[in-house]
A protein has these predicted regions:
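Helix-coil-helix junctions within alpha-helical repeat/solenoid scaffolds
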Residues: 1-195
């Protein structure tokens, strides 16, 4: 992840020098995701908010703006900032017009619901299932692997170790098919702990 961070920061620097808006926005988006995966939720939130600013300024890609707003909320929740306007997040998901991010929207909302408190577990499960269905339908295999990994986390929280192992196993198989060796290694370690 550190290598990704380095190259994305360099890409952002070059885009800003060239005043290149499109690739700059994409680089900011991937940097927000990278920081999230690194567990640096404040930086992830900051970069998602920068993406929102860039997209609001250009008034292009409202569906991507919705995903960035959901991503920022997810980073806030993981940073223990629990006040989130769930209805606005649901509206962003409903208003999405890009099939390839349909599952990501649902997964992010599922992750928010799973981590905001203990009262939204069944809603989180519904949104994670929606993410799985969307990513299967749209053939977004890497994201499908992430969906199953999150589903495994939900079952761990519910105390269902068998279903947690089953879903983590599905995630690992998908990551193997994608050639995502780092993710295979990460989740194989998690699977060994669930034993």
């Amino acid at each position: 992840m550190e290598e990704a961070e380095k190259y994305l920061l360099k890409g952002i620097e070059l885009c800003e020098r060239l005043n290149e808006k499109g690739w700059n926005t994409i680089a900011h988006s991937y940097l927000a995701v990278t920081y999230f995966e690194m567990g640096n939720f404040p930086k992830s939130k900051d970069y998602y908010e920068k993406v929102c600013g860039l997209l609001e300024h250009t008034r292009l890609m409202p569906s991507s703006l919705g995903l960035a707003k959901i991503g920022a909320a997810r980073s806030r929740v993981m940073n223990n900032e629990k006040h989130v306007d769930l209805e606005s997040l649901y509206a962003h998901s409903r208003n999405n017009k890009i099939k390839t991010i349909e599952g990501e929207n649902s997964k992010y909302i599922g992750e928010i619901l799973l981590n905001i408190d203990d009262q939204h577990i069944s809603e989180a499960e519904h949104w994670i299932q929606k993410a799985i269905e969307a990513d299967q339908r749209n053939r977004m295999m890497f994201y499908l692997g992430k969906d199953y990994a999150l589903y495994a986390e939900l079952f761990k929280r519910k105390g269902d170790r068998l279903k947690a192992r089953e879903n983590l196993g599905k995630a690992i198989e998908i990551f193997k098919e994608c050639g995502a060796d780092g993710w295979v290694e990460k989740y194989e370690k998690e699977l060994a702990i669930i034993l």
